[in-house]
Swiss-Prot record:
Extracellular side: 35-61, 108-124, 171-178, 241-251, 304, 368-393
Compartments where found: Cell membrane; Basolateral cell membrane
Keyword set, alphabetical order: Ammonia transport, Cell membrane, Glycoprotein, Membrane, Transmembrane, Transmembrane helix, Transport
Membrane topology per record: Multi-pass membrane protein
Transmembrane segments annotated in the record for this chain: 14-34, 62-82, 87-107, 125-145, 150-170, 179-201, 220-240, 252-272, 283-303, 305-325, 347-367, 394-414
Catalyzed reactions per annotation: NH4(+)(in) = NH4(+)(out); methylamine(out) = methylamine(in); CO2(out) = CO2(in)
Glycosylation sites: N49
Location of the motif Basolateral sorting signal: 429-432
Source organism of the structure: Gorilla gorilla gorilla
Region (Disordered): 439-458
Ranges in the topological domain labelled Cytoplasmic: 1-13, 83-86, 146-149, 202-219, 273-282, 326-346, 415-458
UniProt protein name: Ammonium transporter Rh type B
Protein's GO biological process: ammonium homeostasis; ammonium transmembrane transport; transepithelial ammonium transport
Length: 458
């Protein structure tokens, strides 16, 4: 392990103590507040003489399995493209998600399912917690390779709280419709991470630039993450929608949007690529934007054609972002976006929110019939017009951007505290800083890691 004895000693204690404290505090809060809901508690369920076939587990758990695989396998492997950071990409994804799902159960529980002095949990709580963990992992992608595990846990601690508040404001106070989380998950997670990355800007990061690229096998592993995410994204968007036509429509719209974004990505990648060749970075990421861009509108009457058009647009915009905007983001705005979350989640999330504004504004009783109540209950009840709902959708986007920006700024200041362990500029994107790597002794003998140096946050 590289570094001075003092840093090594601090690293040895910092992560264990923080993990023990967070897990202990979470366990105490669970003991005091968390209880099974009526669909999970043995006595309450059987007291009502329900048939086991009616339990929500049988309707929701298949979607939960897909979402869970996306969070732990999809996100984890999507970030293993860095040639010397695979352990950290998968391992820290595992760590962050495991903590975030516990902490978000509490935060979301206090906001959404707190009654009788307790938080009541079931399979929907598990899905919501995974959604929140997904937002945290999106933010992680923006600072991948430049932060230590203790910093990341503190980032999650703050972000989960702000995620829960933002979600509560949008869904419960503003009545925004966002079935697949274009705003609450993707836009929030992306811009929280981007602002965080800006605050943590490292002017001397060039010292580790040689590790920031991929190699052949790391790109292949990343494609595993891409395919997992691509396959399961219809379940992600439909996981918590109303059973029946709404859930069916959500999966269908996402399915077609993903297909179109993939073709758009291949087309643009070849068009802007050197000698007309495809860029694996584009394929790994931009092909997924079809799932992001229809997140808000997937439950609405978007139409299959609308889903195709939205997906194709998202794929092309994201590919152009990776090719042209990412370098500008770093050189002009000093945002070092390791995974390009602005192109995969940020821009497509904003486009998805704007698409939701458009589709909500076109909602009519004739188009939705009796299904209007499940998609736009306030319009069905006569409390809002379609135009008013569209304006609330637009305001929800601005609220999300505000929470994400302020939260990312606060998170950056928190993570810059001098006692928190982070890799020096010359050791970013390097597994050996935090992991025992097979063959590391031979590697050090040939090319030793640099001695300890100070971080250079701007």
């Amino acid at each position: 392990m590289a570094g001075s004895p003092s840093r090594a000693a601090g690293r040895r204690l910092q992560l264990p103590l923080l993990c023990l404290f967070l897990q202990g505090a979470t366990a105490v809060l669970f003991a005091v507040f968390v209880r099974y809901n009526h669909k999970t508690d043995a006595a309450l369920w059987h007291r009502s003489n329900h048939s086991n076939a009616d339990n929500e587990f049988y309707f929701r758990y298949p979607s939960f399995q897909d979402v869970h695989a996306m969070v732990f396998v999809g996100f984890g492997f999507l970030m293993v493209f860095l040639q010397r950071y695979g352990f950290s990409s998968v391992g820290f994804t595992f760590l962050l998600a495991a903590f975030a799902l516990q902490w978000s159960t509490l935060v979301q529980g206090f906001l959404h399912s707190f009654h009788g002095g307790h938080i009541h949990v079931g399979v929907e709580s598990m899905i919501n917690a995974d959604f929140c963990a997904g937002a945290v992992l999106i933010s992680f992608g923006a600072v991948l390779g430049k932060t230590g595990p203790a910093q990341l846990l503190l980032m999650a601690l703050l972000e989960v709280v702000l995620f829960g508040i933002n979600e509560f404001v949008l869904l419960h106070l503003l009545g925004v419709r966002d079935a697949g989380g274009s705003m609450t998950i993707h836009t929030f997670g992306a811009y929280f991470g981007l602002v965080l990355s800006r605050v943590l800007y490292r002017p001397q990061l060039e010292k580790s630039k040689h590790r920031q690229g991929s190699v052949y096998h790391s790109d292949l592993f990343t494609m595993i993450g891409t395919i997992f995410l691509w396959i399961f994204w219809p379940s992600f968007n439909a996981a918590l929608t109303a059973l029946g036509a709404g859930q069916h429509r959500t999966a269908l719209n996402t399915y077609y949007s993903l297909a179109a974004s993939t073709l758009g990505t291949f087309a643009l990648s070849a068009l802007v690529g050197e000698d007309g060749r495809l860029d694996m970075v584009h394929i790994q990421n931009a092909a997924l934007t079809g799932g992001v861009v229809v997140g808000t509108s997937s439950k609405m009457m978007l139409t299959p054609f609308g889903a195709l058009a939205a997906g194709f647009l998202a794929g092309t915009v994201s590919t152009l972002g990776y090719k042209f905007f990412t370098p500008i983001l770093e050189s002009k705005f000093k945002v070092q976006d390791t995974c390009g979350v602005h192109n995969l989640h940020g821009m497509p999330g904003v486009l998805g929110a704007l698409l939701g504004v458009l589709v909500a504004g076109l909602a009519t009783h004739e188009a939705y019939g009796d299904g209007l109540e499940s998609v736009f209950p306030l319009i069905a009840e006569g409390q809002r017009s379609a135009t008013s709902q569209a304006m609330h959708q637009l305001f929800g986007l601005f609220v999300t951007l505000m929470f994400a920006s302020v939260g990312g700024g606060l998170g950056g200041l928190l993570l810059k505290l001098p006692f928190l362990d982070s890799p020096p500029d010359s050791q970013c994107y390097e597994d050996q800083v935090h992991w025992q790597v097979p063959g590391e002794h031979e590697d050090k003998a040939q090319r030793p890691l640099r001695v300890e140096e100070a971080d250079t946050y701007a």
